[in-house]
């Protein structure tokens, strides 16, 4: 390798990419199973998905992480690299990932298809518009907003209270100026004035529904159950009462189909759906994972941010819908993030600091304990960065050995699948041990308060929950409607185990503050908003978009 570090897009643009029909052949599928979007991208047809339903599922590996730095810790990179390593071990492997959101791509991340020599391609297409799934979800979401405002303009037969509409518009960008807006201005013919707001598309309930629906029939049913707001008697109003579930299903009929692409090393990858894990449930679609499990011997998937967010939601929300629990969990840890948790400044994370690393190790310990609470064996993947010193690597390995934590030093960013062979061996051993004995940390029959308590004490390591007066009133209301039977989806900062993003490491004796609940009945969960978490992010001072361009031949530049 050259001393110059190549960017992700430089590596991806020089890679040999096979026709997606060839990738499908590796899975035993012919061209008729695909709906092509050019040479290198395809959707799997409904006939294909239905034909696989009775096949025995393969083994499932979930990749999660410790609480990350703002730049992320390489969870997607490890997912891809592990998939390629398993392929090299002669395991028929399929990777199942989420689709990237344009918001963070243009904002801070610059892309989300893995990195270095562990990427999913065509990365340029996947990071931008891909097969149009997010645009379809945005259109369906905003069509519903238009239907709501039109209903109020045209007589308001359902007595919708404009002050109590909870459905927001969305756009797949980070745009803080749209968090709170007023619509319907300009006089009687322009609509009924009311306060509104925008979320990012990946926070839309329709995104969550796409990711949890099993088929078109289930999609339509879930869409009909969306609560859009309340009438003047404070009774909930659903999409089904308005009668628009059919139109919304029509807009989403292609977006429900999973997308097939490949890694740099030609491992099949099914990339579909993309809810954030801090403000939604953070997992790719049930349809994608289920299909992958019936096409591969091993499936490697990921859940967003740390194990306190994406993994908890995968295990408590997605697994019941999927009907299959992971056989092994991989927890990605980086030396730079552990140093941050040990008190090192974010501007100094590339400098050697063994003491900060040792102090921050407690964050990793907590995440390993949380995964064990769910009864699933795990392996820690130490995702090696070029800034990691030999002393830091040796210290982290020694700490893992001292505390009986199974680990593997992973170099997939630099070496692709070859850098993850040891990790693959340890994952295979964990899977084949048969030790997985999955159990949820709460039952759906429990009260909302009991579910919150379970998540906070067992996964976050806190001592309890504090409810705002609004949240307390909502619990009474939700019990009346039977909404307390749904799982809880916590909306919480990704940077801390607590709801305070500045409280790093392994904090203790903290409480989680619930400011309000949002019923997402179509998705099948209740969102609990904590702290100051936002459902529409903002851009940083210098967005990643400043470095993006396109050359005269139409080739993208600056995606990373």
Swiss-Prot record:
Residues annotated as binding ATP: 69-76
EC number(s) recorded for this UniProt protein: 6.3.4.3
Annotated pathway: One-carbon metabolism; tetrahydrofolate interconversion
GO biological process: one example: tetrahydrofolate interconversion
Source organism of the structure: Listeria monocytogenes serotype 4b (strain CLIP80459)
Record-linked HAMAP family: FTHFS
GO MF annotations in UniProt: ATP binding; formate-tetrahydrofolate ligase activity
SUPFAM superfamilies the UniProt entry points to: P-loop containing nucleoside triphosphate hydrolases (SSF52540)
Annotated catalysed reactions: (6S)-5,6,7,8-tetrahydrofolate + formate + ATP = (6R)-10-formyltetrahydrofolate + ADP + phosphate
Superkingdom field: Bacteria
The entry's keywords: ATP-binding, Ligase, Nucleotide-binding, One-carbon metabolism
UniProt family annotation: Belongs to the formate--tetrahydrofolate ligase family.
InterPro entries: Formate_THF_ligase, Formate_THF_ligase_CS, P-loop_NTPase
Transmembrane segments: none
EC top class, as a word: ligase
Protein name: Formate--tetrahydrofolate ligase
PROSITE patterns: FTHFS_1, FTHFS_2
